[in-house]
């Protein structure tokens, strides 16, 4: 019993485990958010999307729904089970990322990006609240700084991984008619980066 109390104490081993899991979630958050930037040329070529539309997809559509849902989801984090809110949000934005690979044009892709923004809006307020419970006040600044590293990891991974998937798919299937299900490189990339969040 003493060992259990030590494990689950504020700032104890389980608190550190929670922090690591939240960093991983934040990493997935940024991967799914940033992956669009590495796919811009493929999207313009295959879907006929313009630079202006890409700017809308990358910025306005995502940010609007992130901001709109951020406040109510932050309030929900105060009232409901935070780990459940984070888990549901993670699955939702991961599914929306995968569905982005099925988009047939600007409208459907924008709708899926709306979904990504809405899902990701659940993560940060609930995580800040959760970590504040698991760590004492004199450690929260360093804990939140550590948590924030997930953003930089995610941004780096999204560009590197996205580029690798695109290059691999193009070299393996120069003629996409011969690719599995006729998938384009951008479609495979959306699906591959979204899937891990569902199983986490």
Where do the model's predicted regions map?
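Cytoplasmic helix-loop-helix junction between adjacent transmembrane helices
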Residues: 111-152
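Helix-breaking motifs and short loop linkers at transmembrane-helix boundaries and internal kinks
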Residues: 48, 81, 102-108, 119, ...
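Residue-level signature of mid-helix packing/kink "hotspots" within the transmembrane helices
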Residues: 34, 62-71, 121, 155-156
């Amino acid at each position: 019993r003493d060992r259990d109390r030590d494990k689950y104490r504020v700032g104890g081993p389980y608190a550190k485990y929670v922090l690591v899991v939240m960093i991983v979630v934040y990493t997935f958050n940024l991967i799914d958010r940033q992956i669009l930037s590495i796919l811009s040329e493929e999207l313009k070529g295959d879907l006929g999307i313009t630079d202006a539309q890409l700017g809308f997809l990358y910025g306005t559509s995502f940010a609007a729904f992130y901001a709109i849902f951020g406040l109510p989801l932050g309030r929900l984090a105060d009232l409901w089970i935070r780990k459940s809110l984070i888990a549901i949000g993670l699955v939702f934005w991961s599914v929306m990322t995968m569905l982005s690979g099925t988009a047939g044009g600007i409208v459907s892709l924008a709708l899926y990006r709306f979904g990504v923004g809405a899902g990701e809006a659940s993560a940060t307020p609930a995580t800040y609240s959760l970590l504040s419970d698991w760590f004492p006040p004199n450690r929260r600044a360093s804990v939140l700084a550590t948590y924030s590293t997930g953003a930089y990891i995610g941004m780096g991974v999204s560009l590197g991984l996205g580029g690798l998937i695109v290059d691999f798919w193009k070299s393996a299937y120069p003629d996409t008619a011969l690719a599995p299900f006729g998938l384009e490189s951008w479609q495979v990339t959306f699906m591959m980066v979204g899937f891990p969040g569902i199983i986490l």
